[in-house]
Amino acid sequence: MSGSYNFLFHLIGFGLVSAILTANITIERKLRSETDWGKKLYIGGIMKTFGMFGPFVTVILLVTGIGNIHNLYMGAPEPWYTQGWLVAKVILFAVMATNGLVTAPMLAKKRMVLIKSLSDGSASAGTESTLKKMNTQASLFLLVQVLLLLSILFLSAFGTGKHPGMF
């Protein structure tokens, strides 16, 4: 049995992304259902903790993905970018990573500021309606991330190339 540790770490990275997304979906639902503003602030802190793993997991997937491409196309007569499924996968990963590393922190920070103002009573008149819009944006963000992850998984499973070092 031959295998690549690089491929194994890539699978671990994919599992971490899946775990972070699942945890964020679960915590998002809990945040929306909670009525106490203090508990909502606490739950938001938990979400921030999970969000801190995002850059680490992105680096793991980026480095191991580059390693997998190198292993797969080392000595091949054609370059990797001639494979449409692989180019699509790289583009989807770039969109997902940018979305997760840029959009998510901005959205979470704005939402927590609104919840904090509602918690301490310094909120203006339209804050709750703004918070509802932000909650909808957060749900849409998670839906887009899940769809991107499933698209990447689909391309990995049904793409024309085989990953190096399949166990």
Regions found by a protein language model. Give the residues of each.
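Polytopic transmembrane helical bundles with strong interfacial aromatic enrichment
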Residues: 1-167
